Each structure stands twice: as structure tokens, then as C-alpha cells.
Amino acid sequence: MSKVRDAVAAVLRVNDQICAIVRQSHLLSFPGYHSFPGGKVDRTDADTLPEAPGLEGLDPQQFNALCRELQEELCFDLIAGLRDGTILRVQPLALALAPPFDFVRFRSQFYRIDLACKPDLTPDSGEIAELMWNTPNELLEHFRTGDALMVPPTRWLLEGLADNMDCGDLGDLSPK
């Protein structure tokens, strides 16, 4: 039986485009796969929300993991963006439990982060081979033509966004 670990992922959105990354080819987990910035929720992630607007109802540990991962992977300060108004909204978008194909399964909480404009992002070259802004349909087309590798939860999320970019919470996308 696979161990389940909690994770978070950020779907940064500006108008009809979202930010996706390609993971470095030397990484042990999903090398070369298209994904969203994010990672594991750690025990060290605080269980209180910081002082910033628009955080009501969010899970503190997940939110702090999201902040940490965005800072590590993209040099992006989520709290500063909330405080200065460049981030319009942070909301849970979907939950997905990866299929049991490895020793560890990730239960990923995806968060949509609506931005007023594209931020200046600096990808961590140790983790990220490429950063791109595309529509969900463009990203899915890369997968369909064999130009992109994606784990099932990433595809499920993109399919939901392709159907309705302004959707609220897509709910649990895990296979039933």
C-alpha cells in the first residue's frame, strides 16, 4: 500500500492563461513532466495564517506550504502580492489523490491564484527546466500530441479549467 502525503500546487492565472512548469530531467520524481509550482506540506509549515487580506477559510498549513514553495521555486512572495493588491484572489480549486503507481501517493490541493498582471518570476533552475504561460487547452494539446508528460491530476485539472476557466472549486478530481 502506498503512503499518502499532502501537497499543494499553485495555478497562477492572468486572464485566460495559467503558469505551468516543466520539471528538470534530473529530478527523481516525475522528471521532465509538465506541472504546477508546488510541493509537499511539511510539519514545519505554520498552522496559523499570516496577516494578509483574502485568507479567510484557507487551511493555514497548506497556505504556508504554498507560500514557501512559491518562494523557493519562483522567488514569488505570495504574502506581499496579497498586501499590495497584485494578487486578486487565492482560492481552493481542486483536490486530487494520485493513482497508486509509486511508493508515495500525493493528495494535492490545487489553489487558483488570480493575478492582476503577469509577475516577474525567477524559476529555480535546480527544479524547473521551463516556465510557460498558456491556456489550459494549449497545455492539453501539448499532452495530446506527445509533446508533454503530465500526471493524471494535472490533466484532470486542466480539463476542468478548459471547460470553465472561471469555475469555483472543481472538487475532488480523484478517480472513484
What are these regions (language model features)?
Residues 4, 159-176:
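Core RNA-modification/binding signature centered on pseudouridine synthases
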Residues 118, 138-140:
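A generic structural signal for short hydrophobic patches within well-formed alpha-helices
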Residues 107, 127-130:
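A generic structural signal for well-ordered coil/turn residues at beta-strand boundaries
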Residues 2-53:
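N-terminal strand-loop-strand
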Residues 122-125:
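Cytochrome P450 core scaffold surrounding the K-helix E-X-X-R motif
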Residues 34, 104, 132:
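Residues that recognize and position ribonucleotide moieties
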Residues 12, 22, 112-114, 133-135:
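Short, well-ordered beta-strand micro-motif
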Residues 4-6, 48, 52-120, 145, ...:
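Active-site segment of metal-dependent pyrophosphate-handling enzymes
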